[in-house]
Design a protein with these regions (language model features):
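Non-catalytic, conserved peripheral segments adjacent to functional cores
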Residues: 2-91, 99, 104-107, 111-113
Length: 113
């Protein structure tokens, strides 16, 4: 199956909708303490810079590795990657600016807040 067909199947199977920050998502769990979503970025998409108010953990599921851009001050940033070198999780602390970009055709991750 081609990458385009995999992306289409993931969106349809999980009933994903466009996310305001870019990409597609579906909420799969929510209670008073935690929320978890599946989040999908294609190669032409990115999750735009935004500042989070709660600590968020990203979990890699499939596709190409994902670059995570973070900044404490909104000016200097660093890049981490999940989905390669046995690194499948990354936590972004509350108050941090961050953005996401797939390194290939697509990246499917989970986000837990």
């Amino acid at each position: 199956m081609s990458d385009k067909n995999i992306v289409k199947a993931l969106i349809e199977e999980h009933k994903m909708t466009p996310h305001p920050e870019g990409g597609h998502y579906v909420e799969i769990f929510r209670n008073d303490d935690v929320t978890h979503i599946y989040f999908l970025l294609e190669e032409h998409e990115n999750s735009h810079w935004h500042r989070i108010t709660k600590t968020e953990t990203l979990h890699f599921y499939s596709g190409s590795p994902l670059n995570i851009y973070t900044s404490k001050d909104g000016e200097e940033f660093k890049v981490d990657e999940i989905g390669s070198n046995n690194n499948f999780m990354h936590t972004v602390e509350k108050g941090t600016w961050f953005a996401l970009k797939s390194t290939g055709a697509y990246s499917l991750i989970g986000c837990t807040v």
